[in-house]
């Protein structure tokens, strides 16, 4: 036992024990509240302009009405980019302005606010529905391609080459709006407009329509018609020039027989196209180039397509053909690199098309694309921009660079077709329990084992079972190979497609999902009938063919990124699975836009997890059901 003098007594705290416990319990709740407020402010943060669609696509000019709160007060002159100096320095007071205001018209009120979730992510922007109704009434008058002032050979090629096998061929809404304007039949009698100094001397057009609406033919038909007309005019001028040169040559021979100067050879048209169509990817070069080549079989013009997937020798032979070239389909980077060494490539261009303009005028392509436009401005007559989505960044660029651009839009712009159904699968529920790969495989197995929803055609009895083709979109290209490998382990015929895939593999895979099956030939029908008679003549039951266990038959799946979401004409695809919820409504439109093409039905399925924005998916689904634009 220690002596009494050595024992140290504990010092009592001035704060009681209950107060200490209460203070420590309040600290975590404050931290949670601060983190929750940080997350909420992060959700409300506005996204970049390139990821948000413009609300004023169809409006030619913007006149914003300034609020009184912006004009008066201590902070009225802050954050201004323009001077806005009034001619009359005296301004009226708010009271006098309020007294002089006209009575408000309730019928002229603005529409209700945008969907809350879509507005939070700054998604697709609206066109006024009054404008949409006016466009509908205008295009209802056009019901046939015969109403367009086209050359007979061009009109015949639309039915025989561009849209073969269709009995009732009618122009789509964007074709009814764009073809007459691009043919200049509405502006024939108008005097040429005087342009201010610094403004481009060529005409500018913006074609904005929903996915799968025939935008390629909307600009290609007028271009081909113009090429043939220019060809006829040039032949007459060439004939006239040859006659004049022959007369001059005879006069020179008579006057100065020994002082005849040698004539310069005429400038060759090799490597000098009339029309250039720019697209962002090599896959779109192959698709658009094939459509251009198909029309040339009957209309007889020279076309070519070049991309980085081709060899240098083939690019040189295509572009610098001695016979010349009329229409060229390529990418901006390849064309810009060729123009540095061969500047005459852009010296004869009269029409320039930017297909998928929202990509070509994005941050990655904009410097090169604008450089090409400036180099062709000397001979350029028309600049045509074409896109299914108009982001705010593109709209702002066009209003500054081309304020007089003619905006040709359709009523269903920024809307997913109503013939496309959207389903939602919650992967948090049983039996998936958060396993996204398992949910994707189960959905594909359910679709593969189900019957075909479309009615059988007249050749169904002579054809084998139809192969179902499904697209699976992921947000990251690293996950494309992983998801495809997992699906193959579950007995599904799956392939992956991303920017890392080789060019040849990309062409082979896309060919299976873009080419619709042709009807069987007469020989195939005869062989199928003969085989059917032989099977019926056997008196006993034939042994069934052994099937591999756990293999899903007659189903092909392509796991891809946004490389296949823009412009690819996937007519053979009837189902799209969104493995992840898209980041923006722009991606929603382009991914689900692989369905519902050429008035066909389609089905989209979204896999929604714990951290996904279910409110966005819900409002997109409601907007699709109502047929409204995703604004």
Curated annotation (Swiss-Prot):
**What Gene3D superfamilies does the record tag this protein with?**
P-loop containing nucleotide triphosphate hydrolases
Give compartment(s). Answer: Mitochondrion
Give the matching SUPFAM superfamilies.
P-loop containing nucleoside triphosphate hydrolases
Look up the signal peptide feature and give its range: none
| UniProt keyword list | ATP-binding, Helicase, Hydrolase, Mitochondrion, Nucleotide-binding, RNA-binding, Transit peptide
User: Residues in domain Helicase ATP-binding?
Assistant: 196-408
Motif DEAD box per UniProt: ranges: 355-358
Q: What EC designation does it have?
A: 3.6.4.13
Any one Pfam family here would be: DEAD
Q: Where is the transit peptide?
A: 1-39
Protein's UniProt name: ATP-dependent RNA helicase mrh4, mitochondrial
The organism is: Aspergillus terreus (strain NIH 2624 / FGSC A1156)
